[in-house]
């Protein structure tokens, strides 16, 4: 996973340059890898666990060895009560400290709504997160492994926003 992420983040340094086809292959490989993790409902044995819009009702606090919540955001609403952004806030409030959210296709407000003093929480995004990413950020670290849209980090008080692609 780390090697694929590095390649995705540094693809402009490779011989492929800015070839979108190679980037799409890397994103597909990352999505396939993340979708291969055990479901959160399986319970506590694995460090990385997977949840999606279809299984969102299974969200709970981390147990046992669980450290990273991989969230397939492809089925979530772009914004509102059923959005990926609010789902990530719920995960944070339940005690998750790292979320890897992937398959973004324009869903908005990632990293917003975490509340004051969200230090120690990390979100990694893969795909194409929508605008208002990191707005209201107050301590959390947000890593965008790709391009980001407009309205980034509005009213950002503290934390970190790293974008490995274009803005």
Tell me what each language-model feature is.
Residues 1-167:
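Charge-rich, low-hydrophobicity low-complexity segments
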